[in-house]
Amino acid sequence: WENGHWVEIPAMSIKREYNFDQVGDKDMYLLHHEEIESLAKNIPEAKRIRFFMTFGQSYLDHMRCLEDVGMLSTTPVNFNGQEIVPIQFLKALLPDPASLGPRTKGKTNIGCIFTGKKDGKDKTYYIYNVCDHQECYKEVGSQAISYTTGVPAMCGALMLLTGKWTTKGVHTVEEFDPDPYLDALDKYGLPRSESHNPALVDLSLIHI
């Protein structure tokens, strides 16, 4: 999202390396994610909203190989007299994600970097969480990807049940008071860290 409109680029075409606290240097890719849509709608004064996600080279190599041989296709094909969808067949062959918890190691780092003005002064702020896969498995029997999905949803439900958020209708999280929500995340396993001088992502090579 840039200057009031959507910008489309070829998939996985923009890569940047970033040093993540407790995780280290990782390649991350500019891509679409659904929260950009509600943020652009609810914060119209935002000039730019971007989302990056990290992928290892081995993962990307496997995905490209599967794509090249047609295993990521959603178009049905006939095999031995039966119609199958390649990607659905692939899913049946892959391990259940829930079974990966015991052997998943390392940490996740999920956060947001904001730049703008506050009280007339330029300000940069980085809020993030670091979550350990093995610690999550010890606590709830899942890895950190599931943990960092489930705990925020639980905290959102807690805000509704305790009356912290009372607006009627269908809303997204950025429309509510963030303070009690962030406090709940701190309490229930996703404590925040912050920096007022983070390294910014170099986007100077992107031409729109």
Q: What residues fall within each predicted segment?
A:
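C-terminal catalytic/substrate-binding lobe primarily of soluble NAD(P)-dependent oxidoreductases
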Residues: 1-205
